[in-house]
């Protein structure tokens, strides 16, 4: 058994991870979290919340997982959320083209085109691993789960491929919540869906998974000199820049550079201070949940692998024994791609007014409505038209004026109705005005975390085999059970004292587990195997001097303290 198999065996036995739908044979790409796994995962999530909501001042929203077709059409996912697919001509089994190549040839397929993948398959004579048959040509496969809303399937929809779109759709409401004062951030934690072609990497590649995503909205002019960057500028990180990845003369070790974030920004390795800051936040979070620092690196996306919405992107990659380096976090500069896309397709104004450092003179369009004609044409909706015209940005106003001049009419789409505006309905003229601010479309820095992959890596990095025990060395922040409480023997009132202490620990917010079965050494081993950092034993001395033995997991050190100090001692240590 390799390390992965040992961990999966332990997690199944001890209630961390189970195959979903197991009694029906299971389905690849789905896992259940058992009792301890659910606590572990939630502890990872709550630590993430602490970093982003408490420390960074983001606020959390919760939106539906079912998403209408038009939303994901506008976001670009309908066209771009794809993976390369190959299908066997003989048995018709499907595989991811890039994965099947990497399993047969020592080559990196990241960012390769369909044509390049096809050439690799042909050059290396790669066959179907199931039956040995030849493959059809490489094609694209959209990874979204399709569904419909309501009876009859008339309203097409998808299960969301990311949580981010829920934030972008509600941008106007979120901006109002923050009183339209940039910068501000919103987060969402929840399920996302990816109809993987052939998920054969256990818990690493799931079809239903949990994301924790933050969207930080900022004036694009503020990304270069980001106020918070000063606090992290000296942090040194292992970086794998795009130019080093493409330099074939460098060894794998030479491609990694350790440098401060300040130097990374100054030398153009990281695009700007804003994205560098959230790289630092990611490092802090991963260290707190127990990731092995020697198994962490930040890799820059190459231009040909960049997501359709991204200007720059850095992945936090974690090393695993079986699968090597895996992407667990993406920190992307999404620019204003999403807000612009949704503005265009919804006709809603998603801009924010920002004050200028000094007043400036600008030319703007001033509209005078022919109220008599507009009122006769649109009746009760005339007021809606008037307000909608006031909200048009400069670009939309230019479109309207040009259309009226060239075509004599313009269709204005609003959330209430569409208005066909004729030239005689209004007069538009340019006037000079002194303005104290302007409308902008904010840019977005997005830290996106794959919680399931991170949770698995927490388990693998914590897993240790010693001569006489197996230990899950979880950090205090994420360990599912905080304290094991044992009576040395099941008599003389020891079980009652132990049970009372367990209850007091739980009353103080600590998950404590009572165990009176077997030798004390066996009980310690059971707690070590699930990562419990402290064990407390009630023994004969407890009956005389009210002291107990505390045993620490990692050092195995044992010492005595008064029983009435146990709760405060453990809370301080955690």
Curated annotation (Swiss-Prot):
Q: Which Pfam families match?
A: HGTP_anticodon, tRNA-synt_2b
EC number(s) per UniProt? 6.1.1.14
Q: Which InterPro entries match?
A: aa-tRNA-synt_IIb (IPR002314), aa-tRNA-synth_II (IPR006195), aa-tRNA-synth_II/BPL/LPL (IPR045864), Anticodon-bd (IPR004154), Anticodon-bd_dom_sf (IPR036621), Gly-tRNA_synthase/POLG2 (IPR027031), Gly_tRNA_ligase_arc (IPR022960), GlyRS-like_core (IPR033731)
UniProt keyword list: Aminoacyl-tRNA synthetase, ATP-binding, Cytoplasm, Ligase, Nucleotide-binding, Protein biosynthesis
Cellular component per GO? cytoplasm
The record's annotation in PROSITE patterns points to: AA_TRNA_LIGASE_II (PS50862)
Organism superkingdom = Archaea
What sections of the protein cross the membrane? none
Q: Where is this protein localized, as stated in its record?
A: Cytoplasm
GO BP term, example: glycyl-tRNA aminoacylation
Residues that coordinate or bind ATP: 194-196, 204-209, 327-328, 450-453
Catalyses which reaction(s): tRNA(Gly) + glycine + ATP = glycyl-tRNA(Gly) + AMP + diphosphate
SUPFAM superfamilies referenced in this protein's UniProt entry, alphabetically: Class II aaRS ABD-related, Class II aaRS and biotin synthetases
| Principal subcellular localization | cytoplasm
PANTHER family (UniProt xref): GLYCINE--TRNA LIGASE, GLYCYL-TRNA SYNTHETASE/DNA POLYMERASE SUBUNIT GAMMA-2
The record describes the protein's role as: Catalyzes the attachment of glycine to tRNA(Gly).
Q: Which NCBIfam families match?
A: glyS_dimeric (TIGR00389), PRK04173.1 (NF003211)
- Indicate the family of this protein: Belongs to the class-II aminoacyl-tRNA synthetase family.
**Which protein are we looking at?**
Glycine--tRNA ligase
Q: Which organism is it from?
A: Methanococcus maripaludis (strain C7 / ATCC BAA-1331)
Q: Which lineage? A: Archaea, Methanobacteriati, Methanobacteriota, Methanomada group, Methanococci
